[in-house]
Amino acid sequence: MLWIILAIIVFIVAATLLLFRLEDLSHLDRDDYPIKDATPSEANREVLGRIRELGQSSKGLRGKARLMALRKHMDGLSEGIELASELRHCESPRGEWVLAPGCDTRRRILYIHGGAWAAGSPRSHRAITDRLSQITRAAVFALDYRLMPENRFMDGVRDCREAYKWLLKHGPDGAEPVDFMVVAGDSAGGSHTLGLIAWIRDNGLRQADAAIAFSPSTDLTLTA
């Protein structure tokens, strides 16, 4: 009986490698980046401290408890930060409008947060969306897309698509056509951003006027 189980496991692994083998992107790696002899800035030390805090927030936990701790920590990242923007909850599509004083509601940004597709929310990224609305004078819609593992990856993708179509015709005050449209996101949200604009192109929708992908996850083969 044992050898049958082992044979099945070997077959599954072999079939996976054969059918889902992806391109090796390691040839794109570079090792000639210039190294500057400089003292790390205070901002650099603060970022490293935040990363350490993220690891400490779930130390000793496993499984669902670890994930819940990470989510709670991320949602607290913007706590205590003074925001200039008005925040408005939106039920469908689920998300949050971030409106800096004097922003033009016909100028819109769909912001897709990061968090490894399993954490993060409009709340966790308010420091970013608040600043974006101020700088661009645009109404920012931070999408609260469905996360894994409670949902499938494609559920989050579909949420992004539906939100984009909705934003073309709706602003924070109701039905209103868009004049200028941007899609932006960080990390996992940056990956969703790139996938979304390709889908927009392939489906003949009004294309975004700009797309911003902050540190997007682009190589899921993990070879580069």
Where are these regions (language model features)?
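Alpha/beta-hydrolase superfamily serine-hydrolase fold, recognizing
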Residues: 6-10, 17-23, 55, 84-224
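A glycine/proline-hinged amphipathic helix-loop "lid/cap" segment
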Residues: 2-100
